[in-house]
């Protein structure tokens, strides 16, 4: 077994995706072959789901720590692994396919080959998934609420919990466009990142910093454009993505509808006859 297959299987096992063991025909392996060198794949196989410094990761490997650190930084910029910065110290960990690698590849998702791999593997993941960690949430009409009593599903709670925000292009609609199937909904600066994800995406060149005011404006405009706000994971302390999705472009919204897995909580939407 080579390191590209080993890496795909490791991510599958760590994040408990009930997929068959990978081989060279699988889209995830093809994606890694396109994105990583042999040495990068070997180093990535030494990571797990916890952030570790280069010195820890390379212990027992026949590679200099400085060289490994450069390779790790490069993989983080590519979007294959997550980089965490604490002061002047960097640490690295593996990410699940989604949310994680899928979104982090937005800078290269316009490449038709990469777009095809992402769509194919998304279909594979959906085929074995009972539910996605996503929830559709409403935008409060007054987003600056800062009280403890705010409903779990009100998006202002998530914004209140963080001070760092970023925006990036919609990867799903970018992929659609790369396939010649653009749906017409906006692509530019429609996905919002908060907290540690905002820091990672900005630092590695995948997104740009945004103010709270701009985030609120984007959310309001998304509603005006008929988009749906999706957030995952659902645990509010870990929720770091807010996607503004359309049913004609969002792969996960389309797949969630297919397997009836969009999560609902306290609120039920009804159409008033008035």
Regions found by a protein language model. Give the residues of each.
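Short acidic, hydrophobic short linear motifs in intrinsically disordered regions
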Residues: 50-61
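Short helix-coil-helix linker/hinge
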Residues: 34-40
């Amino acid at each position: 077994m080579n390191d590209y297959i080993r890496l795909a299987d490791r991510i599958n096992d760590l994040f408990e995706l009930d997929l068959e063991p990978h081989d060279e025909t699988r889209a995830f392996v093809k994606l890694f072959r396109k994105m990583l060198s042999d040495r990068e794949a070997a180093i990535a196989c030494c990571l797990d789901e916890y952030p570790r410094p280069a010195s820890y990761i390379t212990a027992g490997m026949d590679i200099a720590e400085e060289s490994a650190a450069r390779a790790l930084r490069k993989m983080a910029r590519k979007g294959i692994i997550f980089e965490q910065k604490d002061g002047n110290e960097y640490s690295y960990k593996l990410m699940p396919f989604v949310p994680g690698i899928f979104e982090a590849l937005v800078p290269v998702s316009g490449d038709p080959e990469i777009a095809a791999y992402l769509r194919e593997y998304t279909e594979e993941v959906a085929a074995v998934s009972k539910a996605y960690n996503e929830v559709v949430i409403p935008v409060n009409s007054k987003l600056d609420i800062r009280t403890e009593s705010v409903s779990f599903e009100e998006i202002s709670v998530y914004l209140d919990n963080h001070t760092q925000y970023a925006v990036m292009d919609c990867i799903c609609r970018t992929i659609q466009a790369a396939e010649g199937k653009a749906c017409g909904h906006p692509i530019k600066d429609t996905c919002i990142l908060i907290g540690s994800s905002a820091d990672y995406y900005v630092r590695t060149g995948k997104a740009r910093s945004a103010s709270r005011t701009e985030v609120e404006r984007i959310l309001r405009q998304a509603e005006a454009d008929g988009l749906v706000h999706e957030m995952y994971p659902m645990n509010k302390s870990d929720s770091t993505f807010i996607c503004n999705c359309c049913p004609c472009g969002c792969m996960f919204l389309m797949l969630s509808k297919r397997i009836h897995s969009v999560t609902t909580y306290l609120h039920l939407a009804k159409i008033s006859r008035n």
